[in-house]
Amino acid sequence: MRASGVVLVVLIFGHLFVNLFAGEGVKAIDFAFVAGKLADPFWVVWDTLLLWLALIHGGNGMRTLVNDYAPNPRVRVVLLVAIAASTAVLITLGTLVIYTFDPCPAGAAAELLPSFCPVP
C-alpha cells in the first residue's frame, strides 16, 4: 500500500497537471484532447497504471476496513467477495476502454476530432 500510494501520488499529480494546468487548462478538455492523449502509447500506459493502482489500492483499503469492522464471518466474506468482484469488473472495463478507444470514430463531426484524424 505504501509503494502504490507513492506511485499514485506521482501519477495523479501528473494527470492533474497535464489536464488542468498545461496548455489551455480545463477549457481545452474535449473529445479531441482525450483522443489525442489516448492515441499516444505513453498516456495509455500512464492511464492504465493509474487505473490499476488506484483500484487495487482502494480495494485493499476497503478490505482492511471490512476485516477491522465486520465481526460476523459470513458478512465479512460477502463483503470481501463484493469488493474483489467490483474491483475486478472495474479494472476489466476500464482497461477495455483505454485499449479499445477509437480516436477517429466514423461519423463523428470533424470539429470534434483531433487534428491527426482524416477528414471525410
Regions found by a protein language model. Name each.
Residues 1-120:
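Membrane-embedded alpha-helical bundles that constitute the cytochrome b-like, heme-associated redox core
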